[in-house]
């Protein structure tokens, strides 16, 4: 610790308080006469004769009485008319400069009871004392130097009552005193607080004053029965670090001592008498310390600090490394003649105390070997700050550039990539809502083939970078969707109507996407039995809005063929609902709940909701080829599950089962009801591969598939067909006696005990199953009855697509049908 040594003495000021109403009523002469700002006379002599109003005589003849006409000279004398601000300017205001330079400072008020010590230190509301004024001035100076230095302020407030130390900010039991060789006198358990502002510090000071012990006596109605010590600690350090960095630590103590009192004048008894005795004891120890320090005159001598806890706490404030100011408060009335005389005598004695001041500056200098490391750390910090500054400026500049531009709408890729005519200025482009939902998501739409063909033409262009999808503010008019080679010529004067039309089209597309998402979410929640009444009411409200929109539709969209023809959102949602299928495993509970599942949002099935089948078929095949090239189009791996009683069929991807024309064969009579709904008939190849036979005759155990929910067979691998999905329907059971001769003429055993999914396999030519295949399948049946599947997993590379598939109706069977048809065995 580096300290600047400086010699000083205790600064002593005297304040004479105004007379009280009781002293004025007694009509006693004052015993204090203030001569000037530094000198006063105690108990001046009266003239023997003369006018009654004349108090002093110019004649000094005759012997002097002991204690009469004594002249005292101090650093400052305040008369009865002095204000709190005057006392502050000549006491703590001057030592604040030394306090901020790292010197310890102390200000304490000493005097008899009722002399005005507490009023000088604390003041009252509207007329604050030294403690409040010092705090306000300290924070004002700290804020002035805040740009150059960083400060840390801590405060503590305690009292010494009956020779016991108590915390005023956090009241608890009595505390002890310890002496540390480095820190000096410390009080373990004393709370330290860090105020954020001067106002918060004043609130803490007020709260501590309310906890202080005060009791009225005959000498003073608001007598303080304890010594209060308010301490402020300040740490300051330069904000710009250097090789020679210093830390300054200083402490300021503002002390309000209790007044000495005489039992004969206060008439104290009991507890008040014991309090007065302890106060006088601690003040006597303080007087002995002052006398010892005054007699020492810089020499090392014994100072009785340990005679009282008060003197132990004030060890650093009185005779140690501290700049000290003593305020002696006296009364001008002759009723307190002895107390005033003793106060002036001890104050005059304190002037002889010499102090050795040392600035508490802690050097943080580093060794020369650490200079290189410090320089590297500082350079890294500067680089990090510069990078943050550049990032902040770049973000602010980008935000400023985007703010004046109007919002832009996304257009198809064939429009955004069209060249502009030469001579036309192209405006700045910004990335907006790109056409993220083009070909991959358009597969789920049930629109006509023309719209799907347009989507497929734009699908390869989506692999381009996102920058290619940006477009200028003045957008060219798009060509008709039916144009074979769409080209766009930029028009400099595009009217407002085109922009509004594009905006409306984009909004409608966005609404359609949201409704489809809500429809799928409703289906999944209903399948999992997670729907709540609130959610059902919200979906019903959405359904009502969709129905109202379907009656009021009339807007045309150049991008969507369905919207261009004026098709409402309800019908487009209808087409979407048919292509959405669930591809997860099916449990018994889900099969029962989904057996009666219909289209959500209350959208009925209509003939116009389906697109043309003949035109959709080649389009679907083309999309399938595109999706097979993508890695995401591969079938999901089967998840191993616990074996159940029913047999699981392979999970079919959306659109994997082919669709056929409705069969014209006669249906089962109405009296024979199916046990559960079943999908429509499928396209069947020449070779049929069946799954294992279920044990039970129940439709659910036979894996009867709900409307849109196929099941997953974990034991069989198939190469599914690549035809477009068929329209979900609820066909009635088919009379097996009237099945087409093609099916009845086969030699293969056919088990009508359960609905069987027909899959397309790859073979050399479309031929009927042979006897060898039938035998192979019959050898598998014993293993099925034991619950273990022995069907081999055929690699997809060995299966080939047949040249010409034919249709086989796949109806659901009831228990009645199972009795009529038995399993054919050899």
Curated annotation (Swiss-Prot):
CDD domains documented for this protein: KISc_KIP3_like
UniProt short sequence motif Nuclear localization signal, positions renumbered to this chain: 618-626
Annotated keywords: ATP-binding, Cell cycle, Cell division, Coiled coil, Cytoplasm, Cytoskeleton, Microtubule, Mitosis, Motor protein, Nucleotide-binding, Nucleus, Phosphoprotein
Domain Kinesin motor: 9-353
Compartments reported by the entry: Nucleus; Cytoplasm; Cytoplasm, Cytoskeleton
InterPro entries: Kinesin-like_fam, Kinesin_motor_CS, Kinesin_motor_dom, Kinesin_motor_dom_sf, P-loop_NTPase
Role noted for this protein: In complex with KIF2C, constitutes the major microtubule plus-end depolymerizing activity in mitotic cells. Its major role may be to transport KIF2C and/or MAPRE1 along microtubules.
Protein name: Kinesin-like protein KIF18B
Natural source organism: Rattus norvegicus
Higher taxonomy: Eukaryota, Metazoa, Chordata, Craniata, Vertebrata
Gene: Kif18b
